[in-house]
Amino acid sequence: KEYTSTLSIDLPHKPGILGKVSTLIGMNDANIINIEMTKRSKDYLQFLFDIQIKDLKNFTNLISQIKQQNLKFKVIRHKKKKYAFIQRVLKNFKRN
């Protein structure tokens, strides 16, 4: 069973950073189903990544790896029951 989540991530203006984040997502067995740039400033770009992910372990690993990159991010919670697993994971992480 796959779950859908949206990650909002602020990426600094650095060559290769979008590729690095996309690779992190893929390495955790998640599929990017949509990317949207929502904000642009001189220092950063804000992207929304809609992802499909197979299980809680992969989601937890992905969030940990994003935190290790020192990126400002948040997970947008979906209100449908099938996304409730994401809410359980978020209780274990401090908000940025």
Which sequence ranges carry the predicted segments?
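A conserved regulatory-domain signal marking ACT and ACT-like small-molecule sensing domains
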Residues: 1-96
